[in-house]
């Protein structure tokens, strides 16, 4: 059951890594050309993307302990933003194995990826406006987290994927040994 989670997560990480080649080797990214905003060009607009100076906190669901983490942290690494990952406790052992291997590889700066297994009560009580929080799980828990005083007062970006369903429905013609079954 974990194969698609692990392989899918690694594939996602590689897909994002390939996007990195499109970025310049700079601590910022200039998006498109400057746009004239006034007659005669005396006032222009230009989008310049810079990384947040905070941390990304990712609170993940039980069903994709590897994929869920890797697809979220991949964009952090592209932006130079460190990540704190809080997987669901019940499947955190898979997340922990992958994080351990990433850290052992020394491919990231020390502290760029951190993991909290078990209770993380209060994890978002210290976030600030330069941080970001993502949550995957139940809508009720997500709403509770999104209404956290710090999230609201600091206007912390909060991204929630809630109550998603993943299923496979096999027809009566699918039997053990068929590709769909295996």
For the regions a language model picked out, list residue spans one by one.
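Long amphipathic alpha-helix in the N-terminal Rossmann-like dinucleotide-binding domain
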Residues: 1-42
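Hydrophobic packing residues within well-ordered alpha-helices of enzyme cores
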Residues: 13, 95-98, 126-127, 145
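Conserved small-residue-rich beta-alpha loop and adjacent elements
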Residues: 25-106
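Generic beta-strand/beta-sheet core signal
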Residues: 59, 79, 86-88, 116-118, ...
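ALDH superfamily catalytic-core signature
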Residues: 101-106, 112, 130-132, 141-182
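Beta-loop-alpha module in the N-terminal Rossmann-like domain of NAD(P)-dependent dehydrogenases
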Residues: 56, 63, 117-125, 137-142
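A structured beta-alpha segment of the ubiquitous adenosine-cofactor-binding alpha/beta core
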Residues: 45-46, 113-134
